[in-house]
């Protein structure tokens, strides 16, 4: 007796559906391969290089250290980066597993509410995690970019001593935000005895001034070159730097000796040794 088509469809509907391997997590959101959490079976707790950035493993059971900015990452067994960080490859092409570097997803330095500059907002957040939250005015980002500060002389000019006709120079290195304007001045005295600042190079044909940025960000290096050196060039030279926040100065001295005071050494003739 042939089966009725309606009966066949009814039997098909009543058949249990096979489990489909869709790789979905269970209703609880856990990895299907994870068993019951047993903390006693977790690896012994390790002291994380950077405390405060810890997460749970994929099963939500054992604690894992997260990589801070600049830490190695990537690979199957490599470290995971902390919040706000991404694992970037160190090489332009293909690189071995575990050779990535944790970098901040938001590039650029920031100014913190504590008046300090941080290389990235991730570095500021890490500092904020480590700072006591009970203190008033908890650390936060004040603005993008480094904090402003008045010029600071990093390398002051060194005093020089030379003879007339020689070539000498003085240099100084200054750091500030915004980047400072650096000038050279010669400290002189008026006939009345008051101090006078003479801007250089002025009318001096043997003096040149050069200023360039660097060697690091928000730094400036300035030189004053004297060639040829004359007796009237002797004196005190000031390296002056200024920006919208403040100013700073440092001094170097040039001492000049007349070349005519030095005589060429006379070596004894062969006959003089007899």
Swiss-Prot record:
Keyword Iron: no
Regions that span the bilayer: none
Organism name: Bos taurus (Bovine)
Domain (Kazal-like) ranges: 91-149
Xref: Pfam families: I-set, IGFBP, Kazal_2
High-level lineage: Eukaryota, Metazoa, Chordata, Craniata, Vertebrata
Domain IGFBP N-terminal: 30-105
Protein name: Insulin-like growth factor-binding protein-like 1
Protein's gene: IGFBPL1
Ig-like C2-type domain ranges (all copies): 151-255
GO cellular component: collagen-containing extracellular matrix; extracellular space
Single GO biological process annotation from the record: regulation of signal transduction
Chain's role: IGF-binding proteins prolong the half-life of IGFs and have been shown to either inhibit or stimulate the growth promoting effects of the IGFs in cell culture. They alter the interaction of IGFs with their cell surface receptors.
Disulfide pattern: 34-59, 37-61, 42-62, 48-65, 73-87, 81-102, 111-147, 172-239
Record's signal peptide: 1-21
Entry keywords, A to Z: Disulfide bond, Glycoprotein, Immunoglobulin domain, Secreted, Signal
UniProt-recorded Gene Ontology molecular function terms: insulin-like growth factor binding
Top-level taxon in the UniProt lineage: Eukaryota
Xref: PANTHER family: INSULIN-LIKE GROWTH FACTOR BINDING PROTEIN-RELATED, INSULIN-LIKE GROWTH FACTOR-BINDING PROTEIN-LIKE 1
Residues with glycosylation annotation: 162
